[in-house]
């Protein structure tokens, strides 16, 4: 892959730690050296990203299924932000700032003239263990009101909250109240561990860095990391928090990539530009934050602002998604890569295509050759 033109590798630290990746990093460095390449090693921090929990095996979700949402215990003390951010985030997370999304009147039969709601309401509240369970961070629970949408795995799976129930159980003479949340599957699919989760419209403020992020940053330099990618950047204080952690680790020379994945990042892009070494247009979660038909326009707006400021930017997500299972890309995919380069992208990156795909070498071949074709067109 290096011999074909690959310039580096990205590790997603939502699934593995740097300390666990020593063998893989060593193989990458040896392969690059054989090809005369000085490789980039980018690491994607966990940051404020929301993800589902770890499960022993994938869960098949079918349209119309009812699933139960349960919690991943949130260890608030294991998360870290800079002092000013910590106070601000705590204030924003209070219930008074929760943006409620009204339930749609005809969703699951709520309202007159629809009997489905009353039947579902009786059927939802069964004994624990009778539903497929999806784990979400508990900080999402105040937002799980009927009508709230939940998008999983970059929007491939679409749920809608239909019921919130409370069980009262007696334990040692004391009553314990347990809240349970139920959702209807609108678009099904195969859900695996640690997939992205989004609640469109909900204002959720997880901490900028987790304890795991800080541990990874501490050893980033000795592991040969050249760039840190901060997900879901909301404002420049997120980037300053990461910079502070890099300084404390003696790793100020590691480049900082700001991932634009929500509308906060889009709106505040001008303020983010001076604080980041490179902007990442991360179209997976960004495509959950806007209508998909608006995503190309948002991508172009970000590209224009980066060009005007002289700031390099990267385009990622589904560049060659069909090649996870096909040895040949679609015409639309090569067109996408071509126009990303023509719009001024300094770099492009594939993810699942090489991480879990069947044709990683062919992915790099098509990507590199398409980039070279675009560069040739630019210079014509």
Predicted regions and their residues:
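Non-catalytic helical/linker scaffolds that mediate oligomerization, partner binding
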Residues: 1-110, 117-380
């Amino acid at each position: 892959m290096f011999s074909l033109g690959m310039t580096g590798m990205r590790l997603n630290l939502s699934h593995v730690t740097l300390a666990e990746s020593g063998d893989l990093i060593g193989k990458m460095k040896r392969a690059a050296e054989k090809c005369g390449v000085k490789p980039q090693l980018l690491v994607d921090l966990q940051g404020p990203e929301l993800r589902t929990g770890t499960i022993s095996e994938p869960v098949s979700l079918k349209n119309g299924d009812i699933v139960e949402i349960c919690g991943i215990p949130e260890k608030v003390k294991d998360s870290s932000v800079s002092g000013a951010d910590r106070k601000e985030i705590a204030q924003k997370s209070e219930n008074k700032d929760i943006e409620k999304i009204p339930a749609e009147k005809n969703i699951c039969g709520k309202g007159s003239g629809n009997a489905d709601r009353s039947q579902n309401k009786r059927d939802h509240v069964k004994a624990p263990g009778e539903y497929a369970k999806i784990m979400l961070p508990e900080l999402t629970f105040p937002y799980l009101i009927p009508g709230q949408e939940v998008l999983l795995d970059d929007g491939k799976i679409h749920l809608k909250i239909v019921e919130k129930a409370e069980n009262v159980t007696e334990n040692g003479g004391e009553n314990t109240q347990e809240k349970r949340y139920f959702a209807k599957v609108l678009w099904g699919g195969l859900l695996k561990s640690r997939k992205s989760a989004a609640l469109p419209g909900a204002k959720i403020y997880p901490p900028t860095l987790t304890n795991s992020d800080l541990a990874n940053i501490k050893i980033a330099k000795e592991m040969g990391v050249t760039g840190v990618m901060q997900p879901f950047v909301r404002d420049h204080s997120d980037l300053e928090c990461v910079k502070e952690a890099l300084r404390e680790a003696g790793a100020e020379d590691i480049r900082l990539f700001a991932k634009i994945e929500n509308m906060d990042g889009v709106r505040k892009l001008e303020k983010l530009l001076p604080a980041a070494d490179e902007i990442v247009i991360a179209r997976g979660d960004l495509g959950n934050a806007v209508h998909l038909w608006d995503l190309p326009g948002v991508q172009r707006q970000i590209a224009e602002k980066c060009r005007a400021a002289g700031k390099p930017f990267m385009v990622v997500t589904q560049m060659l998604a069909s090649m996870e299972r096909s040895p040949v890309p679609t015409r639309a995919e090569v067109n996408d890569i071509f126009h990303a380069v023509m719009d001024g992208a300094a770099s492009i990156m594939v993810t699942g295509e090489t991480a879990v795909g069947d044709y990683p070498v062919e992915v790099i071949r098509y990507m590199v050759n398409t980039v070279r074709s675009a560069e040739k067109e630019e210079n014509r």
